[in-house]
Amino acid sequence: MQNQKIRIRLKAFDYRLIDKSAVEIVETAKRTGAVVKGPVPLPTRIERFDVLRSPHVNKTSRDQFEIRTHLRLMDIIDPTDKTVDALMKLDLPAGVDVEIKL
């Protein structure tokens, strides 16, 4: 697998989970002899929702909620077969979405 790179994109609502997962991936890749660029924090996406507090009156009284989606980007350059096998066996937390591109 020479002259290749694996791009890993992590997405989660909790920044602690995503940072812990990124450290795990970097340690695993470095242990198997690959070069890692990142993790690079991408802009956090914030979705805000306004909900009426009362079902009947008081239009000006509202609750505000938000969801923050945190993103991290990593590149693994010149991965070996051991690197790919180790990344496949890696057990990450349930709240982290992993997107891998070769």
From Swiss-Prot:
It holds the Pfam family Ribosomal_S10. Belongs to the universal ribosomal protein uS10 family. It comes from the Bacteria. Involved in the binding of tRNA to the ribosomes. Part of the 30S ribosomal subunit. The keyword Electron transport does not apply. The gene is rpsJ. The keyword Nucleotide-binding does not apply. Gene3D superfamilies: Ribosomal protein S10 domain (3.30.70.600). This is Small ribosomal subunit protein uS10. One of its GO terms (biological process) is translation. It comes from Nitrosomonas eutropha (strain DSM 101675 / C91 / Nm57).
